[in-house]
Swiss-Prot record:
One of the primary rRNA binding proteins, it binds directly to 16S rRNA where it nucleates assembly of the head domain of the 30S subunit. Is located at the subunit interface close to the decoding center, probably blocks exit of the E-site tRNA. This is Small ribosomal subunit protein uS7. GO terms for molecular function: rRNA binding; structural constituent of ribosome; tRNA binding. It comes from Staphylococcus saprophyticus subsp. saprophyticus (strain ATCC 15305 / DSM 20229 / NCIMB 8711 / NCTC 7292 / S-41). Belongs to the universal ribosomal protein uS7 family. The keyword Mitochondrion does not apply.
Length: 156
């Protein structure tokens, strides 16, 4: 941590096509080795597939999917008297978004379809319908927090 106060948070520029900061953040999550153009091509192709398959605006479906993925609670390890407890804590809004995007991209990469565009599009559609790997991850995270509710008084 810096000694001289906090470091200002850099704001991302909204995406030029959809004018959405969330879309820019997703592009940054998809991007590997600094290849932004490739990441943008993947995302825009996936959005075309989403629009074609759902009949709705792709960004609307994407935002609905992210809302279904973002966790409200998570567990953090807390050491008390020689033993570690998994303590449920609320997730900050910024971290909720980050986790949602990370899980969406990671579970897209694990899917079986041939191209990344298809994988991402199908994961977005699944998440919008409350199914798919990313939503399951959120459910598992919430279950873990619920199971460890007894340790909630160890919060800090």
């Amino acid at each position: 941590m810096p000694r001289k106060g906090s470091v200002p948070k850099r704001d991302v520029l909204p995406d030029p096509i959809h004018n959405s900061k969330l879309v820019t953040k997703l592009i940054n999550k998809i991007m590997l080795d600094g290849k932004r153009g490739t990441a943008q091509r993947i995302l825009y192709s996936a959005f075309d597939l989403v629009k074609e398959r759902s009949g709705r605006e792709a960004v609307e479906v994407f935002e609905e999917a992210i809302d279904n993925i973002m966790p409200v609670l998570e567990v953090k390890a807390r050491r008390v008297g020689g033993s570690n407890y998994q303590v449920p804590v609320e997730v900050r809004p910024e971290r909720r978004t980050t986790l949602g995007l990370r899980w969406l991209v990671n579970y897209s990469r694990l899917r079986g379809e041939k191209t990344m565009e298809e994988r991402l599009a199908n994961e977005i559609l699944d998440a919008a319908n409350n199914t798919g790997g990313a939503v399951k991850k959120r459910e598992d995270t919430h279950k873990m927090a619920e199971a460890n509710k007894a340790f909630a008084h160890y919060r800090w």
